[in-house]
Amino acid sequence: MALKIVDKFRKKSDKDQYLVALDIGTEYVKALIGRVVDNQVEIIGVGRQHQRLTDMQSGAVTDIAGVVDNCDAALRQAEEMAGVVGKDTVMGIAGELVKGTATTIKYKRTDAQSRIEMPELRNILDRVQDRAFERARETLAWETGQQEIDVKMVNTAIVDVQIDGYRVTNPIGFQGRDVTIQLFNAFAPMVHIGALQQVANNLDLNTINIAAEPFAVAKSVGGEDTADFSAIFID
């Protein structure tokens, strides 16, 4: 009966926009189906499935086939509740091998009278990300004992920008000499990311984003207009 309900609404999901959120935890897989309404997501389906001890370790997938079965069970629960099938998914990534780092760079502009444009800002951000990438790679290499470990950035966000000591939310168009930018980046090993992508492929889902879960939680609570917001999250 559940499959008939899903099939009945399958065509509807082609007209409306739905998103699937998958949180593949060490103990449980959690699945959400949401309807996109005015740039917000209305949750219409929820499901979860217990994982075996051999499926995950420290937040990382160790048995792709086992995790696929668990995700499928959680998705069926969410689909039955929602009455629709989503195809686009956002997957959470966590665990001890996901590294988040805040990097600060300070530099003096040669022409303080010129206005900051996008190419200049992009060059600064690239330098910050390169520095953060090497730091994350060195940390993961030390922790895993693998010197040639492939790492990929999963999230990035500007935390703070100051020009001549003056805090701004968008540096484009400003003049000044001393620029300080703090950038948060989250990195994860490619083997970890590749396992999640394979899980999504086996479930016939289109992965639109893989997000670092601690970053996603802070982003959803903090918002865009709360530069002075700070909090401690306890799981």
Placement of each model-derived feature along the sequence:
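Nucleotide/phosphate-binding catalytic cleft detector across ATP-hydrolyzing
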Residues: 1-28, 32-89, 93-232
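Active-site cofactor/substrate anionic-group-binding motifs, chiefly glycine-
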Residues: 235
